[in-house]
Amino acid sequence: MADTATTASAAAASAASASSDAPPFQLGKPRFQQTSFYGRFRHFLDIIDPRTLFVTERRLREAVQLLEDYKHGTLRPGVTNEQLWSAQKIKQAILHPDTNEKIFMPFRMSGYIPFGTPIVVGLLLPNQTLASTVFWQWLNQSHNACVNYANRNATKPSPASKFIQGYLGAVISAVSIAVGLNVLVQKANKFTPATRLLIQRFVPFPAVASANICNVVLMRYGELEEGIDVLDSDGNLVGSSKIAARHALLETALTRVVLPMPILVLPPIVMSMLEKTALLQARPRLLLPVQSLVCLAAFGLALPLAISLFPQMSEIETSQLEPEIAQATSSRTVVYNKGL
């Protein structure tokens, strides 16, 4: 029976390949090559596609059933690779890969930009009070924490205390740095009011970037002590490496510093120029809608670019790792999961 199912699945895949320009479908595999930046960029554009937020319950069930039919070799004739890739995209966007439960819409990766943009606009509002600075930094870190938790690796039980620790560390560092920098700018008498206002607009970036690093370190410091799994080219477990863990945390931290840079730096620069135009000076009510559009554009570009910097499964030479790792495999390189 297993041979029959495999033959049927292969025949269906062959028929799909002949009727579609899409690459041959591979269940559970990315549609685009992950070895190049462009391939990863295309892959993450699919993951954050906000159109999947509007998928109906019926369409989700159809997508899941189509993938089940493919898996068991019972795929109906005429199904194309494009339909299979689309079904997998829908399932991965909505259902958690480990629990198979629906992820709450605001915390899906496809909802990160639509639900995160209003927070970015709030972070960049001019003339903020102490209370508003604290509120927007807290809301931003709360949203990030919920996204991280909703998309966590659920194959192994993880204590809630670890997530709470990372969340509190991120909130405290973000709020303290934002408030501290705002106070310093306000007390800097050598700046003109206009210069002071311009500088204050850039305060959210160092606050958010430092909070992101703090969050990564607090939530994953255990990996530095215990190491992370490294695999050979065939996917076999070679061992656990602390050096690979350092590389993984460094890559993740760098990604989380790069991500807010265009989101929180470009809009203030663009808005400082747009505010001088005759249109916005004559119609100040347009300032907030225009800033929202600028933030949305920056967010939409920055997110896929930042998370495409490094492959999800990063490669490292065994000669750079612990001697016991190098001795445990004949492979010249091994791979590790860097995490989100």
From Swiss-Prot:
Transmembrane segments: 103-123, 163-183, 254-274, 287-307
Annotated coiled-coil segments of the chain: none
Domain of life: Eukaryota
Main subcellular localisation: mitochondrion
Matches recorded under InterPro entries: Mtc
Key words, A-Z: Amino-acid transport, Membrane, Mitochondrion, Mitochondrion inner membrane, Transmembrane, Transmembrane helix, Transport
Single GO MF annotation: monoatomic ion transmembrane transporter activity
CC annotations in GO: mitochondrial inner membrane; mitochondrion
Keyword check for Transmembrane helix: yes
Protein family: Belongs to the sideroflexin family.
Function of the molecule: Mitochondrial amino-acid transporter. Transports citrate. Does not act as a serine transporter: not able to mediate transport of serine into mitochondria. In brown adipose tissue, plays a role in the regulation of UCP1-dependent thermogenesis probably by supporting mitochondrial glycerol-3-phosphate utilization.
UniProt name for this protein: Sideroflexin-5
Species this protein is from: Homo sapiens
